[in-house]
Amino acid sequence: MIKNIFFIMFFLTSLTLKVNAACDDLPEDGVVYSGCAFADSQDLSSSYLPNADMTFVSFIGVIFNKSIMLNSRMDNSQFPESSWVRSNLYESSMQNSNFEDSDFTSANLHKVSFRGSSLLNVNFSKALMTEVDLTGANIQGAVFDQTLLGNAIFPDGTKCAVDSVGECKKMK
């Protein structure tokens, strides 16, 4: 009986350690941070995080400037007041997440999905947003100065013409 209790306690402890260990892993290709809550305002500039799983995370005020995060998953997460200047987020999924008051200036957002996300007051100036999906997203107050929006889908389902820059010209 005592042996069984000891085994169960050891098993549960090892599971807990494995879950927490992922949150402490260094940024790298394919890292899994799913469900982690991080300290506010971390500077992770120039991070290499392609194929990362950052679903259900909290990263308030994080700085990911000049980071490479191709094909990463950041769905259902909290990234308000974050900075992604000149980051490469090609084909990433950022659905149903909070990016309010964030800065994506000059970021590569080609084929990124922001479906259902809160993008209030986000700066997308000079970003590459071709084929971006903003279906159901809240883009109130968002800035698109000199942003390439060819074939982007806006929140109301409008598909932008290929030559859309700074504003979505409805496809003919």
Predicted regions: what they are:
Residues N4-I5, V19:
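Hydrophobic alpha-helical segments, especially transmembrane helices
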Residues A21-K172:
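Tandem repeat scaffolds
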